[in-house]
Amino acid sequence: MPRFSLDAVRGFDRAVYVVAAGQLLNVFGSGLVYPFATIHFHLEIGIALSLVGLGLLVKNVSTAVATTVGGYLADRIGRKPVMVAAMAGNAVTLAGYAFVPAIAAAVGPLDPAGAFIGVSALAGATNGLYTPAGQAYIADLTDGAERDRAYSLLKVGNNVGFGTGFVVGGLLYEWAEVTVFLADGATSAVVAVVLFALVPRIHAGQRDVALRDSVGDWGSAITKRRVLGLAALNLCFAVLYAQMQTTVPVVAEAELGLSSSEIGTLFVLNPLTLVLLQIPLVDAVSDWRRTRGLLFSVGFWAASMFVVWLVYLLDLGPAAAGRHPLLAAGVVLVGLHLVARTIGEVLHSPISTSLMSALGSDGERGAQLSMLEVAKRAGFGIGSFVGGVFFDYGLAAWLWPSLIGVCVVLGLGLLTFERTLSPVENGVATEG
């Protein structure tokens, strides 16, 4: 394994660093609310947990739909306008979570659950516009292995912000609960200003193309067999991703008896692992075929699901008199899950994005990356729903071997997909 140095994060265009800093701040806002949103709306506002889950599903669907629009707009009118507009919209919709009870009181037919679902739909829409435009902007400024490193830099920035948000959010939530939602919106407003002022417009879009032709180009970009194949694989990865937000916290609380503050502290392992390993690990596999890096990722995902399954196999139930050693073992297993699934995430996210970027022309890139994001959001929604079904019907112990089965399917799918790629598309440098 090559020794990591700061050279891995040097040499990018200044705009890459500005976008990375902006995403760090934006994801800091997300970290403020991530551990506490479900607690707030279920325990404090009194919305049924199933309806909170429905709101999160609606948000993911809305994000997926908006992502297709965001990718199209990124190609048609340029990356920067879409990025700025999306962040400005986020400032309003994310802050709207603080006013869910007030919205329900002001709009007669709505109860708090309906208001929560409505705000979630709007928040998903504004959030979905940003991702394909931001990823395409970075792709425009980088190529080859440099692009993998740039996406890794974004991931590190995201997770420094996310982990810091956990800590600061805990302090804010104890002081005044709704401040975490207001602060989340405020961070997006700051990012919108930073992008508008400091990021140059390097892609002017393709305004001279007729609407009918534009739609045709967009449709062609996202209906290519390999694009759809990679999107399907990404959906399966996202089903695995979703468990950290939906079912793993339930295991930690209901099975192991951890408090919300203990769960939040334990979950810091996710961003901590990302910050420590994202750039050196991706740099270490940069000479591999991209599909082999993704296979390596699948191995860690499978291991992460297995260690949670052990909580059930070893009957590490809620703490009771005399069961403290078993409780400690259960906490270690959940911690191992978080570390292993995060290593899987470290490898998957930048490599899959680079692979999709390599499958089309510059004009198709925004739409293709939007397809990747749509698949991820769909997988999040499916993973959350399916995980909830297993728990609701008393089959929680069987969720984890089922997810290991998903990992097996992913591995076979990647080996099949690899056969369709040229060496250059798969990240292998050729001499010439």
Give residue ranges: language-model regions.
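A membrane-interface helix-boundary motif in multi-pass transporters
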Residues: 173-186, 389-407
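C-terminal ends and interior cores of transmembrane alpha-helices
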Residues: 88-109, 300-326
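Juxtamembrane intracellular "pre-TM" segments in multi-pass secondary transporters
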Residues: 1-13, 200-233, 432
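Cytoplasmic helix-loop-helix junction between adjacent transmembrane helices
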Residues: 119-160
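Cytoplasmic membrane-interface "Motif A"-like loop-to-helix N-cap segments
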Residues: 76-87, 287-299
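Short amphipathic helix-loop junctions that connect adjacent transmembrane helices
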Residues: 35-50, 246-262
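Residue-level signature of mid-helix packing/kink "hotspots" within the transmembrane helices
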Residues: 60-68, 162-163, 271-279, 380-381
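Helix-to-loop junctions at the C-terminal end of transmembrane segments
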Residues: 66-78, 277-290, 391
